[in-house]
Swiss-Prot record:
Organism field: Dictyostelium discoideum (Social amoeba)
The UniProt record lists the keyword RNA-binding: no
Kinase listed as a keyword: yes
GO cellular component, one term: cytoplasm
Full protein name: Probable serine/threonine-protein kinase roco4
Domain COR positions: 591-787
Compositionally biased intervals (Polar residues): 1319-1331, 1349-1364
Transmembrane segments: none
SMART domains: LRR_TYP, TyrKc, WD40
Top EC class for this record: transferase
Active-site residues from the entry: 1154
Gene3D superfamilies in the cross-refs: P-loop containing nucleotide triphosphate hydrolases, Phosphorylase Kinase, domain 1, Ribonuclease Inhibitor, ROC domain from the Parkinson's disease-associated leucine-rich repeat kinase 2, Transferase(Phosphotransferase) domain 1, Winged helix-like DNA-binding domain superfamily/Winged helix DNA-binding domain, YVTN repeat-like/Quinoprotein amine dehydrogenase
Domain Roc: 364-544
């Protein structure tokens, strides 16, 4: 070790502790020094860590000049320690004596005499303490002992007899620490008293100081004071504080009441020594210091009567202060006290103590006098002026009087109106209609409402009507407290006022719980009526109990803390300044910091609750309380639950900023996310934008359109079809008489009539309509949408056009600059805590005038001038139907017009004041010939019903169906309308038609007027087609019978809907709709792991379904006497996962919402059966267009976000959580949470708030444990996609099956059987299905009859497990193929040209090993041409390789033969390939990384990187900052998200990055040049040590394992490093492994395999690496890389172009072999 290394290690040690020396003297010093320095001698004095070094001063001085550097490679740290010891001064003397030597008696006498003389001399100088001394007498060996004489001569000096090393060394260390501590504290006490540092004095006292030492220090302080009086210096002023504290402590024992004043003592914290050693104080003055926190231990000063704390920096007061029973005076002036209610502080000492006591005793005894006062009404009616008048603002009359032309640009303005009795929190809502959708989420029950209107407005009743109904609809069924306030009374006649009052009394007073003085007429200009209104508001606040008198005090503490953090008006120094708009950088910085406190995340909020003394079970109540009062805003939904808004005004400003933004392109209703900088730039931090978009979506201001980086803002759409929208509508939607009289049109539809509907409903519906597949939107506006319904042939054509467009866009993206994408990636990198990321990678969008939501047209525009430009030309090419009248063609065409009509006049008494109209037309065909229109009608009604049921509960809704007979007879007259319930009753009675009242003689077919009720897609079965057998089930819906189909005697289950006579109309409709919903969902599902629907029956309504013979999973698990085998359990898990994966891959995804063991049915318990488990019972299922909602039961199975979620929204990820519970149930046989016994309320709270989950058994396989824990994550976005789940379960199941084999034949048969092998490969195929799922809207299971096929088929990404399963055991299992092009015409693989040189039929998994040779040659792959393989990667059932000629080859993992070859679309040279989930990441020597989908064999993403030259990749699957790490020759390291492909982090090193490796513990080892860099992925900290390097050459490969890191170099050497701790490596070995560069290091169980360009591969035992097995046989050229295919199979890639791939079989254990010669491969859970 050279001197620089010694110095560096010494400095590192110095940073950890300070060395303190003990001078060891005497004949036995060598023994003492050797033994004591071998121990850990670290200890603490005060707050500093020391390490004792025992040394001989004379000897170190003598040897210091003779030290030489030692350059040996592996050297201990002793030399560095020794050099560091030279610089240490002795702080203690240790004299050693030989207890067997008589001379020791004389020697100790001489030393004692010398010590006494020294002590006497130093007593005169108290400032310099004497260095302590102690004796050690070594009494070891034979012979007489003189210990007793020596001890007698030692006198009072501490004495230790050394007999046994272990015991004596501990005693020596104990005496050493005591003496050194006493000595050091004496010095520091003297210093603290001398300089008057009370803070440090307190710290010393708290560390433990004897009373004698304190008295000595007190005496020294008196000496200083006395000296100052003699010399007239000011030292006495300096030591006043320290003297006072020491005096109080020293005199505390006399138990007399003392006073202590430490005023102006520069205290930075409360002296804790006071609470411990001054317990008899009666008065304590700590004023005018810098104390920031008062400790809870203040309660220990029981005698305290006066406590003066004014002029400090206190933010809070501990509740424990209430235990100071004698405290009479508490002075807290001039303290911030931001975290304690100011009103309580101002109420006096007695009330403050009582307040704190009530909180500790959990008493609800505080009064809350803050009341939310809501000002609502149209713009220009005087709301702001009324608020100012109530506030008592002294504005001029001209300012107070608001004219009708005044328009607010703020959505909500919040102010305070204070009064002695009550403090009103006034919310002034902007009256413009664009703000209306933003208001409803601010409206709460616990508030007073002022519905303000202008008395001079002739239509004031219509304005009042809307707001009264809006407030009522947001009151959760309660009656709100509404005051009707008319302004401008001064310009009205008494007659006008009387008429207005009569209108208000007759129509609106009934909606308010305020029965007296509800109506108020005021004049803000003169103040008339203002005082009376204010009195009435205060009276109502008291009467309605809005002034709360029984709330917990900790609510007030929490409110104080949050208000302090929030940016409330008047408290923010820069609240009015735009960010970046200040005059200085300092101002801008302050503004940014202020803005960040306008919201906090939920974890931070929980901490605030804890600091506010709230128990976990109290947090929800406190949150709801503050939310309802408008202090904070918090929405307990998956997207927003992590956000707590501290400043509602800020949130209102965010919404206003978007709605009132004046750019024309936003006014057209579409916001491009790339333009957000124009809206929010300089106002809101860019990292917050994705979360703001989600907030705006929650408040119905905008809707983020999936995957296209745009948002729809419905309130900014044109209200009516005007301009170009009107032109398109008039051209394509002919009048009803024209359509009917043409004789070529069939019409049907329905109306939804609402008594009231808040604004924003149609905007939410419009979003869902835009996402329905199989339609082509022609145009839409704020209250309507016109679309074409595509036939199946047109859907196929549409998908073809879409794929072409995507290819064009991908090509365009490759050619254009990606600046916008880079910018957005940077934005997201700053927002790692936000789960919602703006996806700006897609350039597709929606066209507002002519477009299809299923295709991806280019630009979006409403600008009339752009309709005829090139963009329109492109759009017209994408549209299936031309923009012409349907009457101009004879081809079939289906149309739908959906419009929302709101009430036009208050005087209208019609029930249909708000109407949603759906009209569907079929031209040149009938609904009997083409079901497209009927199926769409079912879909749209299902969508509407779901939206109404989930978000508009309590509204009065009637559904009416127009009579088509009336329409056909006279299209110009209003038709008769059938009631929806009458249609249901007719179907219930088996009647196929109704009779119109306008023409009772003509029957009207129900399937014509309400095709959604008849579900033409589902076959209808007659009673004589079914044979009933027995009842097998019963539920709330009705009965379930077992039966048979007459035609083929196949067994079925018949589920009947029984509607009782006692049930009301509403209940009957709800039950029927639930029945219809299940039929609708099941009619669109076709998968072997989902119960199949065969048909429908009527009178009563019945579903004929597939019969599943083995019952449900719940009852099977109850049979404890016959437990299910582990292999069968795995098969059940996989089957259920496949079924749910299929549901979630639908567009939109299906959310089951009731996944639990009773709804899982068992087809077979034979693990090799085609199907074992099926998902059933879709009565509660919904389609998820972003989210669904609704209150559910069975909370043990439900995701946290769905429990009690009547108004919350959630996604299909809720089913993922429930699936975790099913996995747990199958694994353990127990129900979820059976191990706990809580009440339901506590259960739900613990599941939602505390993350309670069932206990997974310890013997659960790690892979399954990981799947379960990921699936039941509390954060829905962290739950995995089912393609990952299927892959994990398939691999687990595949491993379990193969572990049972015991001989060659059985192994071969099992591995070749279709059921076993497909289980492992289907996951790869299914992984690929996710990418293209949105492009393939039809079911991806059209070939369900392949289960028993005798030929081997390729696994298509769009086909499921059971479809791909074959039962023939003689055929080879097909690999996970990227495309069906792998199959020849006969249905088998085209493999004639390719084979492994050793055997074309070899199964590599079963290759026999040579018992005497650890590395066994399998063969070389021969190909049809020469190829230079650049890189390779294992991809499940295939191995991918990339060649220099841009060829991409796919080889069978098990057979080793070439399956297929494709031409790569790019020509860049590949440097590395790795597998990441269902993707292959390909690094190149350019600046690009290509990401391939394993299923579709297409490039799904190209990443632009900062790398140059050779690029390496490493995949970190678990832990913090997981993802793909990349490094390049320029020295940059990047982390990429493995799902969104966005860059998350990056940093740079000095040298090229050549390799990376990760084992665990959040540690990534990076090879950079010749050095190893240790990088912590959790903290993003790295450590570089000059010792961690190769002495010659650079590092070319690196391998991290549990306790070791192996690094291979360009010189052929391998260095082995010991991992000492998380930031420290120690080189332990250097191996001369190869003669040239090491290209690969592969971990194989207990071995490490290396490859080199010297043509060799070497196998090292980790336990004994010095004796490797090396071979270069079969390698004609150097090994460039090694691909680990299985646990014991590796493929060596060489630079030889004729035999580039050499296959090797390597056992896990060299010595361990089975009886038949097959080495064990994997460990499995049984």
């Amino acid at each position: 070790m050279d001197s620089s290394q010694q110095l560096q290690e010494s400095q590192q040690l110095q940073q950890q502790y300070t060395r303190v020396g003990i001078d060891v003297i005497g004949p036995m010093k060598d023994l003492i020094i050797s033994v004591m320095n071998s121990l850990d001698t670290t200890f603490k004095i005060i707050n500093e860590t020391y390490r004792i070094v025992y040394f001989d001063t004379d000897e170190t001085k003598l040897t210091s000049s003779n030290l030489d550097s030692d350059d040996e490679e592996f050297e201990s740290d002793d030399d560095a320690d020794e050099e560091a010891d030279l610089q240490i001064q002795a702080s203690c003397n240790l004299y050693t004596f030989d207890g067997k030597n008589r001379q020791s008696v004389d020697e100790i006498k001489r030393i004692v005499q010398h010590l006494n003389e020294t002590q006497s001399q130093q007593n005169d100088n108290q400032a310099v303490p004497v260095i302590p001394t102690f004796f050690v007498v070594v009494n070891i060996g034979v012979g007489p002992s003189f210990v007793s004489e020596i001890k007698s001569a030692a006198g009072t000096t501490q004495f230790i007899e050394w007999i046994v090393n272990d015991q004596a060394s501990k005693e020596v260390f104990k005496v050493s620490t005591n003496l050194l501590s006493h000595h050091k504290k004496q010095i520091e006490l003297t210093h603290a008293c001398t300089v008057g540092d009370v803070n440090y004095l307190d710290q010393i006292i708290l560390s433990g100081v004897s009373t004698d030492q304190l008295k000595e220090a007190h005496k020294a302080g008196h000496a200083i004071v006395f000296d100052s009086l003699l010399t007239h210096n000011s030292n006495s002023l300096v030591v006043t504080g320290t003297m006072a504290l020491l005096g109080a402590i020293v005199e505390n024992g006399d138990r007399k009441g003392k006073r202590l004043s430490l005023s102006r003592s520069n205290l930075s914290r409360f002296p804790m020594s006071i609470t411990q050693m001054c317990t008899h104080l009666v008065e304590l003055d700590l004023s005018d210091n810098k104390i920031t926190e008062l400790p809870k231990d203040i309660q220990l000063l029981k005698s305290l009567r006066i406590l003066i704390l004014r002029g400090n920096l206190l933010e809070d007061i501990p509740l424990e202060i209430c235990y100071l029973g004698d405290l009479k005076i508490l002075e807290l002036q001039e303290n911030p006290l931001n975290n304690f209610p100011l009103s309580v502080v101002q109420s006096g000492t007695k009330n403050l103590l009582l307040f704190c006591k009530n909180i500790l005793e959990r008493k609800k005894s505080e009064t809350w006098n803050k009341v939310k006062l809501m000002f609502v009404g149209q713009e220009g009616v005087g709301k702001t002026s009324l608020c100012q008048a109530l506030k008592g603002s002294k504005k001029k009359k001209a300012e107070l009087q608001v004219t009708g032309d005044t328009v607010s640009t703020e959505g909500v303005k919040i102010q305070n109106i204070k009064n002695k009795k009550v403090e009103f929190h006034a919310w002034d809502f902007g009256g413009q209609q664009v703000f209306y959708p933003t208001h409803q989420f601010f409206l709460t029950t616990h508030a007073l409402y002022l519905v303000v209107f202008k008395l001079t407005d002739p239509n004031f009743a219509e304005r009042v009507n809307y707001w009264v109904r809006q407030v009522k609809s947001n009151s959760s069924g309660a009656v709100p407290a509404i005051f009707l306030v008319g302004t401008h009374s001064d310009v009205c006649t008494p007659e006008q006022l009387q008429e207005a009052e009569s209108i208000l009394k007759a129509n609106f007073v009934k909606y308010s719980r305020v029965k007296e003085n509800t109506i108020n007429f005021v004049c803000c200009a003169t103040g008339k009526g203002i005082k009376e209104l204010k009195k009435r508001l205060i009276h109502e606040a008291e009467k309605s109990h809005l002034i709360k008198k029984d709330i917990p005090g900790n609510y007030m503490v929490l409110e104080a803390r949050l208000t302090n953090r929030g940016a409330n008006p008047g408290r923010m120094a820069v609240s009015g300044s735009p960010i970046g708009g200040g005059s200085s950088a300092q101002l801008s910085s302050n503004a940014i910091n202020s803005q960040k406190e306008r919201y906090i995340d939920y974890d931070d909020y929980m901490n605030e609750c804890k600091l506010s003394h709230l128990q976990p079970e109290e947090i929800k109540g406190a949150t709801d309380f503050l939310h309802n009062l408008g202090i904070i805003l918090h929405f307990d939904t998956p997207t927003l639950k992590n956000l707590v808004v501290l400043d509602p005004q800020w949130l209102a400003d965010v919404m206003s900023s978007l709605i009132t933004f004046s750019h024309n392109w936003i006014k057209r209703g579409i916001l491009n996310h790339s333009e957000l900088v124009a809206v929010w730039g300089g106002k809101y931090d860019q990292s917050l934008w994705p979360l703001l978009l989600k907030l705006l979506e929650k408040f119905e201001v905008s809707y983020e359109l999936p995957n296209i980086a745009k948002s729809l803002i419905p309130s900014l759409l044109p209200e009516d079809a005007e301009g170009e929208i009107s032109t398109i509508k008039d051209r394509e939607w002919v009048t009803l008489p024209q359509a009917i009289e043409s004789g070529r049109c069939q019409v049907f539809g329905c109306d939804y009539n609402f008594d009231f509907m808040p604004l924003g409903f149609f905007a939410r519906l419009l979003l869902r309509i835009l996402l329905i597949s199989g339609v082509e939107v022609r145009t839409y506006w704020r209250n309507g949408v016109l679309l074409d319904i595509l036939t199946p042939e047109q859907v196929k054509l549409q998908q073809s056009k879409q794929q072409q467009l995507q290819q064009q866009q991908q090509q365009q993206n490759n050619n254009e600059s990606n600046d916008s994408s880079v910018n957005n990636n940077n934005n997201n990198n700053n927002n790692n805590n936000n789960n919602n990321i703006i996806n700006s990678s897609s350039s597709s969008s929606l066209n507002l005038t002519q477009t299809s939501t299923s295709t991806s047209p280019s630009k979006l525009s409403l600008n009339n001038s752009q309709i005829n430009n090139s963009n329109s030309t492109l759009n017209s090419q994408q549209l299936i139907n031309p923009s012409v009248s349907p009457l101009s063609s004879t081809t079939p065409r289906h149309q739908a017009l959906i419009t929302f009509i709101k009430k036009k006049s208050f005087e209208s008494k019609d029930k249909d004041s708000y109407k949603l109209n759906i009209e569907v037309r079929s031209f040149n065909t009938t609904i009997e010939k083409d079901h497209s229109a009927s199926l769409f009608f079912q879909q749209i009604l299902f969508t509407i019903d779901t939206l109404l049921a989930s978000s508009y509960v309590g509204l009065e809704i009637t559904r009416m169906i127009p009579c088509i007979h009336c329409v056909q007879k006279n299209p110009r007259a209003d038709p008769y309308y059938f009631d929806f319930s009458s249609c249901i009753s007719a179907l219930q009675d088996g009647k196929p038609h109704l009779f119109c009242r306008n023409d009772p003689s003509i029957p009207v077919r129900i399937d014509y007027i309400a095709p959604d009720l008849c579900l033409k897609k589902v076959p209808t079965l007659a009673d004589n087609e079914i044979e009933y057998e027995k009842q097998i089930g019963k539920g709330g819906f009705g009965l379930v019978h077992k039966g048979r189909l007459v035609k083929d005697k196949s067994v079925v289950a018949i589920k009947s809907l029984i509607l009782g006579d006692s049930e009301g109309e509403t209940e009957m409709i709800e039950k029927f709709q639930e029945f219809q919903r299940e039929v609708f969902i099941m009619s669109n599902l076709n998968h072997p792991n989902i119960v199949k629907l065969y048909g429908l029956m009527h009178n009563p309504p019945r579903m004929v379904m597939e019969f599943v013979p083995c019952g449900d999973l719940y009852h099977r698990l109850l049979d404890k006497a016959h437990p299910i085998k582990w292999s069968v359990k795995l098969r059940l898990m996989l089957d259920i996962a496949l079924g749910i994966e299929y549901m979630q891959n639908q567009n939109p995804p299906i959310v089951h919402r009731d996944l639990r063991s009773p709804n899982i049915f068992l087809q077979s318990l034979d693990e090799n059966a085609p199907v074992c488990a099926k998902v059933a019972d879709f009565g509660l299922s919904q389609q998820s267009v972003h989210s669904v909602s609704g209150l559910l039961g069975n909370f043990q199975w439900m995701a946290p976000e769905t429990i009690g979620a009547e108004e919350e929204s959630y996604t299909e990820k809720a089913d993922t959580y429930s699936f975790a519970m099913i996995l747990y149930t199958i694994l353990t046989g127990e129900g979820p949470f059976d191990e706990y016994s809580y009440g339901k309320i506590k259960f739900i709270n613990m599941i939602r708030e505390e993350g309670l989950r069932p206990t997974i058994p310890e013997d659960c396989p790690p892979r399954l444990r990981n799947v379960i824990e990921l699936c039941w994550s509390g954060d829905p976005k962290k739950r995995p996609h089912f393609s990952y789940i299927v892959k994990e379960l398939s691999e687990l199941r595949n491993g379990n099956t193969t572990s049972t084999t015991t001989n060659t034949s059985s192994t071969t048969n099992n591995l070749n059987s279709a059921n076993v092998s497909i289980a492992s490969t289907s996951s790869n195929a299914d992984d690929g299905s996710q990418t293209n799922n949105n492009n393939n809207n039809n079911n991806n299971n059209n070939n369900n009859n392949n289960n028993n096929s005798g030929s081997s088929i390729a696994l298509s990404p769009s086909r499921s497990f059971e479809q791909q399963t074959t039962t023939t055991t003689t055929t080879t299992t097909s690999p996970s193929s990227p495309s069906t092009s792998f199959i020849n015409s006969s249905g088998s693989y085209n493999t004639e040209s390719y084979s492994v040189a050793s055997s074309s039929t070899t199964n590599l998994l079963n290759t026999l090993n040579n018992a005497n040779q650890p590395v066994n040659f399998i063969g070389t792959a021969s190909v049809h041409k020469k190829m230079e393989v650049l890189a390779g990667v294992e991809a499940g059932e295939t191995v991918w390789t990339k060649s220099a000629d841009s060829s991409l080859c796919f080889w069978s993992t098990k057979k080793g033969h070439l399956i297929n070859e494709l031409k790569c679309p790019h020509t860049v040279a590949t440097t590395m390939m790795i597998k990441v989930g269902k993707y292959i990441w390909e690094a190149t020597n350019s600046n690009g990384i290509y990401i391939w989908d394993m299923g579709t064999m297409t490039i799904v993403q190209q990443l632009t990187t900062p790398h140059k030259g050779d690029v390496c990749l490493h995949f970190v699957e678990y832990g913090d900052n997981n993802g793909v790490w990349s490094g390049g020759s320029e020295g940059t390291v990047c982390l990429w998200d493995m799902q969104t492909f966005e860059k998350k982090h990056s940093f740079s090193l000095e040298s090229a990055i050549t390799a990376m490796s990760y084992f665990g513990n959040n540690t990534l080892y990076i090879a950079s040049g010749s050095h190893i860099v240790v990088f912590k992925t959790k903290t993003l900290l790295m450590n570089v040590n000059q010792n961690w390097k190769h002495s010659t050459g650079s590092i070319t490969s690196i391998l991290a394992m549990k306790d070791e890191v192996w690094s291979g170099g360009s010189d052929g050497r391998i260095y082995i490093w010991k991992v000492k701790n998380e930031f420290e490596l120690q080189k332990v070995q250097s191996l001369e492994a190869h003669h040239e560069k090491i290209t690969s290091l592969i971990h194989l169980e207990d071995n490490v395999l290396s490859g080199s360009t010297d043509k060799c591969i070497s196998l090292f035992k980790i336990s004994d690496p010095k004796k490797p097995f090396t071979t270069q046989e079969h390698h004609k050229q150097g090994v460039t890389s090694i691909v680990k295919v299985q646990s014991h199979i590796v493929w060596a890639i060489t630079s030889d172009t004729t035999t580039p791939l050499v296959l090797w079989n390597i056992p896990q254990k060299w010595e361990k072999k089975t009886a038949n010669g097959i080495l064990p491969r994997l460990k499995f859970f049984r």
